[in-house]
Each structure stands twice: as C-alpha cells, then as structure tokens.
C-alpha cells in the first residue's frame, strides 16, 4: 500500500520547525533534540513494521476468505443442480403414486360393494333368526309367568303357614319369658329386701357412732368456750382499769389542749388576715385547677369512650366474621339439604312408581285369579249336577257326596275370602301410599297436578293402617 500524504505534510512541518529551532539552539540542546528525534524515529519504524505485518495478515485473510467464498458458491451451484434433479424425480414418483391410488380406490370400491351385499344378506338371515328366537322367547316368557304365578301362590300358602307357626312360637316364648321374668323379679325382690335390712342396720350403727362423736365434740367445745369466756372476762377487767388511768391522763391533756387552743385561735386570727390578702390569687388558681380537672376528666372520658368504641368495633368485626362463617356454613348446608331433598324426591317418585306398578299388577293378578276360581267353581258345580242326575245314586251315597262337596266348597270359599282379603289389603296399602305421597308433595310445596300422571285409586275403605274392612 502507498504511504499517506498527511504524514509527509506533518514531517515537512516538523522539519521546518526543527530547522528554525536549530538555528537558535546550543549544542547541548541540539544533542537532546537529536536523542529525542532518534527515539521518535525508532518508534515510528516499529509502528511501520507492525502496520506492515497487520497489512500482510489482512491480505492473507482476504485471500483465504475469497477462496472459501468461491468454494461455497461452487457447492451452492452443485446443491441447486441436485435440488432440481430431486424435484424432477419427486414429480415422477408423485405421478406413479397417483396412479397407484387410483387403482387402490377402484379395488376398494369393488370390495365395498361386495361386502355391502354380503352384509345385507347376513343381516336378513340374522333378522329371520332373531324373529324366530323372539317367538320362542315370548313362549318361554309366558310359560315362566305362569310358573311364577303358581310359585307365588305356593309361596303365599307357605308364608301363611309359617306366620301361624311363628305366632305359636312367639306366644310360647312370651309365656316362657314372662315366667322367667316373674322368677327373676321375686328373686331380686328377696335380695333387695335383704340388702335394705342390712343397709338399715348399718345406717343405725353409723348414726349412733356419729351421735357419740358429736356429743364428745360438743362437750369439748363447751369446755373451750368456758375457758375463753374466763380469759375474755379477765381481759376486759384489765382494760377497764387501764381505761380509768387513761381517762385521768386524758383530762390533763384536755386542759393542756384548751390552753393551746386559745393560743392557736389568736394565731388563726392573724393567719386569717393574711389569707384575706392571698384569697384572690388563690381563687383564680383554684378556678384554673378546676378547669384543668374538667379538661382532664373530659380527656379521660374521651379516652375511655375511644377504648370502648375500639372494643365494640373489634367485637362487631368478630361477630361479622362469625356471621359470615355461619352464613357460609348455612349456605353449604342449605345446598346440601336441597340436593338431598332432590335425591329423596327422585327416590320417592321412583319407589312410588315401582310400588304402584307392583301393587297394580298384584291386585290385577289376584282379581283375575279370583274370577278364574269363581268360573271354575261354577263349572264344577254344573258338572257335578250333571253327574249326579245321570248317576241315579241312592240317598245315603248322595248325602255323603254332598257333604264332601260342601266341605270342598267351604275350603274353596275360605281360599277365595283370603284372596279377597289380600286384594283389599293390597288396594288399601296402595291407596294409603298415594295419600302419603300427595301429603308429602303438599308438604314440600309441589302441586299434585305437576306429577305428570294421575294415580289410580281403588275402591277400598279408609280405615287405620293395617285394618282392612270390606267395601
């Protein structure tokens, strides 16, 4: 690189100044200047060498960077060519995949049509099979219902017999327990009497011992009181003698006090005269003191009222916090009670509906059974009358047969009455349940019309719970 022109101008100026200074300087000064100039020259040479090295380094770095840049540009051109080739290959692959997708869609459509036809055929076969199975299940269901009705009747007979046996066992156990209770009562009454006698004897002994102890204590107290009375009597006798001596000395003191009183009255008159002179400033000072006392009292009152107000404020804040906490607790309890009420109401509706269905179904079954038994009885009576008229039996045999038939009829009538009683009992329970349900709805403030259906009320009596009266 070429040297800069500014440096030459500065050097020419320095040389001109130096020549001007040399003309008017001595030898020593010139030697000193020569030394300084040599030092500056050495520094400048070092600086020039350093700058030359830096310039060489920069040129070397620039050459290396230029070479790297050309290499990177060549790599970039190669990458661009590779990208173009890859793009062309990618387009070709996309076309191939599109063609494959078309073939797959066509095959998939064919598979869907075949599967749809197979599925429709299988569905039709399954529907036929399910219809057949549904018919078989309907028959089985009807047979099971008939068996269930028969089992219910048999269970009711068994339950009736078990209730009778249970009642007998209960009466027997009650009698046994009553006898045991009587025995235990008599036994413990004897024990109580013996204990009462023992306690009475022990009480009398303890009372006698207590009376003896109290009598000895009373005698000791009387002796102590007598000794104390004698001591007090002697004490007061001594006091009276001492008081007489004291009265004499006091009389002498009174005379001396009278003399002093006269002297003091004279002195008081003089002091009163002096006090008249000092009364006016004293009254002013007393007024100021009274005013200050009033201010102090007002300050104390204000301080006390402030403390009381702070205490009331703290108490009110505590009460507000307690009330807020109670309000939060009550609101949570109210929401909980509301949810419980809704749950109970839902359960109550479900139970009412289930009981209504069960009672309705049971009453309908019992009524149908009673009707069927009545029809069967009428048919049996008609058949029996035909058989008897066709048989032409003798009167004795006919009487025995009639008696036997009457017994059978009586048994059947008893069964019919029991069934009618069960029907009436179930109907009454159903009606009572409906009334309780309506009362609960009224209690919760829910109109009965919002129920959504009207409960079926049967025609039975409205007697007490558990009592069934024939309608």
Swiss-Prot record:
Residues 23-239, 282-425 form a coiled coil. It holds the Pfam family GAS. One of its GO terms (cellular component) is microtubule. InterPro entries: GAS8 (IPR039308), GAS8_dom (IPR025593). Residues 1-24 are annotated as: Disordered. It is found in: Cytoplasm, Cytoskeleton; Cytoplasm, Cytoskeleton, Flagellum axoneme; Cytoplasm, Cytoskeleton, Flagellum basal body. GO terms for molecular function: microtubule binding; small GTPase binding. Disruption phenotype: Defects in DRC4 give the pf2 phenotype characterized by disruption of the assembly of several other N-DRC subunits and an altered waveform that results in slow swimming cells. It comes from the Eukaryota. One of its GO terms (biological process) is cilium movement involved in cell motility. Belongs to the DRC4 family. Component of the nexin-dynein regulatory complex (N-DRC), a key regulator of ciliary/flagellar motility which maintains the alignment and integrity of the distal axoneme and regulates microtubule sliding in motile axonemes. Plays an important role in the assembly of the N-DRC linker. Component of the nexin-dynein regulatory complex (N-DRC). Interacts with DRC1, DRC2 and DRC5. This is Dynein regulatory complex subunit 4. It comes from Chlamydomonas reinhardtii (Chlamydomonas smithii). The gene is DRC4.
